[in-house]
């Protein structure tokens, strides 16, 4: 029988070789066709007496990237249809049966009575890695870039094809929990040390090694199916188990504040499953998986962190009639920390980079920063010396603007000062080649006004990076009023080249990300001035799902920079454009107390020298508060809601103001740009899943109690009255082919 996604061959020794190769895809995924065909293959190889064993591998560079999450999203749509037509019991049964399909196929492999070997030739994640765990032997091809793991938790799910049951039956409970709850990918060496891989061999010997294991009489029985099998960490109710699970629950609560149902389900699956035979344990896993699959958190995270992000990365916002840019060489003007980092990630992406500053010494310092980054990667084993040398070889440091003459794209990353930027543009324009695109990395100054200093405003655009550039995945592309399609296409092509996720926004003060995150920081200041204890402010924010508290974030941004932005805004727009009480607080901290934030080791927090303890809130902070509220009288849930609502309502305003024109970008941008509670799916999904009517009611309540910053825009009032959602009213367009 011919298959679409697999090739099945049997050699003279009776060993079947299954080669996975989905046509038209760069990676194999577990989709509907793969399920049907793999199920058929398992049945055929099991029934064929001539087949002595089975090897499964991939024809692509990677083994399998995991489940096709759009298939899982489709299961939820089917659930809603069956729920409407046949009721809850029928819908639940349908979802349970469909969602455990791969789990059942893998169990059929495992109990086929014939030895199965996974010949892992590259990346194996999620359901792809679970497939290998159901094989009786796992052999991997040597490759320092290969990663194995179960990242489902990152999109609000958990491994539902046996991962929560097989992993803790192979490795120690603590290691199993780390793998399942963190979703981090393992190197081959780490996987082998944990016994998740049995052997690592040269790539040329991979299939031979897999077949040799079968020929040598490899067992066709999983360890947990053998009589007398003992769990690596002992029974759940043993001394070790009792040390593990109560502590694990405490750690889970500390890390997630119970915002992620999938994490709780993992704990339950492992705890309950390890007390049962494997078949019953797999049914337990499947029941929890079906429950989590229909949770709003999973729906929101799958949509934003997988589907939307994938569409944006593929060029959903790219003008279709502009040919590919074919970037080869770029320049970064300003070799400070930000500019040097932009230069590094560009060189890492394979581009030639000219790093320019006011003098050679400053330019060399920028290149030295890039050198320190690659040296760190080599030291950690995350890059080979040859790769590091190649990256550094692509960076040229200079003070000579004439080096711009053959650059396709120039990114300005100089000081946030209009005069300095204008001088830079005047120098640069003398040397730009025809058709070169010019971008500013400004984080605060409107692009349209900056473009006035540029001759051809159609070639001027904003490319806003987030710090630290090496780690932050988001890039905000800002369209000035005159920015043309070629500039936009070039910027998007550039962001794709350096492996980051773009969002495209229209020009306004603060653009999108800073508009929202400044509301978060300001709400922290507001609570501080209300008399909420500083520790309570920080903890409530983290409980709401934010990665760091607003006071800590202020320190990271730099208090003196925050004050400078306030003063610039006041100068441009007048005294009513800023909160004067907040300015007074910043003046006290920065100008009177000399506290600039992490940069000088003192801000809202005190920062000890490296290696000498953790940061702690400045003991004298309370003296700067005009009053002090009793923490026992404060509603923590309301504090949490204030942090999320104030950011979400600002995001809604950016839609009304046409700063955001694609709802996906608000959600993806808010999570990647400033860590807005990922379990919500982002700022607009937070509103949609709460319901616009309920959200507007909450806004009115907070407006009456705390002020106009919570007032919903007219657009949101209108949507609430009609029962609309953002994704319903503004359905996103699909990515360009």
Q: Which residues does each predicted region cover?
A:
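Gly/Ser-rich catalytic serine loop of serine hydrolases
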Residues: 118-128
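Conserved catalytic cysteine-centered active-site region
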Residues: 105-118
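Conserved CoA-thioester-binding segment of acyl-CoA-metabolizing enzymes
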Residues: 1-57
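Short, active-site-adjacent cap segments at secondary-structure transitions
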Residues: 61-65, 125-126, 445-446
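Amphipathic alpha-helical interaction surfaces in cytosolic regulatory modules
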Residues: 33, 47, 60-77, 106
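Structural motif
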Residues: 15-19, 37, 55-57, 117-119, ...
């Amino acid at each position: 029988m011919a298959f679409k996604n697999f090739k099945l061959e049997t050699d003279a020794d009776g060993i079947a070789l299954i080669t996975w190769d989905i046509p038209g895809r760069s990676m194999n995924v577990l989709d509907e066709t793969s399920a049907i065909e793999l199920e058929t293959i398992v049945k055929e190889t099991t029934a064929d007496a001539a087949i002595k064993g089975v090897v499964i591998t991939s024809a692509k560079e990677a083994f399998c990237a995991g489940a096709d999450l759009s298939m899982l999203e489709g299961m939820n749509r089917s659930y809603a249809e069956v729920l409407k037509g046949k009721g809850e019991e029928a819908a639940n049964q349908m979802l349970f049966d469909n969602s455990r399909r791969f789990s059942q196929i893998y169990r059929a492999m495992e109990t086929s009575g014939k030895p199965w070997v996974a010949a892992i030739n590259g990346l194996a994640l999620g359901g792809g890695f679970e497939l290998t765990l159901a094989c009786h032997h796992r052999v991997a091809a040597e490759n320092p870039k290969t990663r194995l793991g179960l990242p489902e938790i990152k999109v609000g799910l958990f491994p539902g094809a046996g991962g929560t049951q097989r992993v803790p039956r192979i490795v120690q409970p603590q290691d199993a929990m780390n793998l399942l709850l963190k979703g981090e990918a393992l190197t081959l060496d780490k996987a082998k040390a944990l016994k998740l891989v049995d052997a690592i061999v040269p790539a040329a010997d991979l299939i031979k090694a897999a077949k040799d294991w079968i020929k040598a009489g490899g067992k066709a029985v999983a360890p947990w199916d053998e009589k007398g099998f003992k769990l690596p960490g002992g029974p759940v109710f043993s001394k070790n188990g009792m040390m593990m699970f109560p502590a694990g629950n405490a750690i889970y609560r500390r890390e997630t504040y119970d915002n992620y149902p999938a994490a709780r389900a993992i704990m339950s699956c492992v705890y309950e499953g390890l007390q049962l035979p494997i078949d019953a344990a797999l049914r337990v896993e499947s029941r929890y998986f079906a429950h989590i699959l229909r949770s709003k958190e999973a729906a929101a995270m799958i949509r934003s962190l997988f589907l939307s992000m994938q569409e944006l990365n593929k060029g959903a916002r790219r003008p279709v009639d502009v040919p590919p840019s074919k970037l080869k060489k770029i320049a970064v003007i300003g070799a400070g920390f930000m500019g040097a980092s932009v230069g590094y990630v560009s060189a890492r992406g394979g581009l030639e980079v000219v790093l320019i500053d006011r003098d050679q010494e400053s330019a060399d310092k920028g290149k030295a920063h890039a050198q320190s980054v690659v040296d760190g990667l080599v030291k950690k084993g995350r890059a080979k010396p040859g790769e590091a040398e190649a990256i550094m070889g692509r960076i040229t440091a200079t003070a000579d603007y004439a080096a711009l003459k053959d650059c396709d794209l120039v990114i300005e990353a100089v000081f946030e000062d209009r005069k300095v930027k204008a001088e830079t543009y005047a120098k640069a324009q003398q040397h730009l080649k025809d058709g070169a695109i010019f971008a500013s990395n400004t984080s605060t100054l409107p692009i349209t006004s900056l473009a006035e200093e540029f001759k051809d405003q159609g070639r001027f655009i904003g490319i806003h990076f987030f710090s630290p550039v090496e780690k932050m995945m988001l890039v905000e592309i800002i369209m000035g009023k005159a920015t043309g399609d070629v500039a936009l296409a070039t910027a998007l092509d550039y962001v794709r080249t350096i492996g980051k996720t773009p969002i495209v926004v229209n020009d306004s003060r603060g653009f999108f990300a800073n508009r929202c995150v400044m509301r978060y920081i300001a709400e922290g200041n507001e609570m501080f001035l209300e008399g909420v204890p500083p520790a309570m402010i920080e903890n409530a924010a983290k409980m709401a799902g934010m990665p760091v508290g607003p006071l800590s974030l202020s320190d990271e941004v730099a208090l003196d920079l925050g004050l400078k932005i306030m003063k610039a805004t006041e100068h441009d727009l007048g005294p009513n454009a800023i909160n004067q009480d907040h300015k007074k607080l910043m003046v006290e901290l920065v100008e009177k107390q000399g506290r600039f934030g992490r940069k000088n080791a003192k801000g809202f927090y005190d920062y000890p020298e490296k290696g000498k303890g953790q940061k702690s809130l400045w003991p004298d902070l309370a003296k700067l508060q005009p009053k002090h509220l009793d923490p026992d009288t404060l509603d923590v849930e309301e504090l949490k809601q204030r942090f999320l609502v104030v950011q979400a309502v600002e995001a809604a305003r950016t839609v009304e103001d046409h700063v955001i024109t694609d709802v996906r970008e608000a959600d993806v941008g808010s999570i990647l740009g400033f860590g807005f509670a990922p379990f919500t799916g982002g700022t607009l999904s937070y509103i949609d899943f709460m319901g616009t009517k309920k959200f507007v009611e909450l806004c009115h309540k907070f407006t009456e109690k705390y002020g106009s910053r919570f007032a919903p825009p007219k657009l949101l009032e209108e949507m609430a009255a009609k029962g609309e959602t953002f994704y319903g009213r503004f359905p996103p367009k699909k990515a360009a082919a």
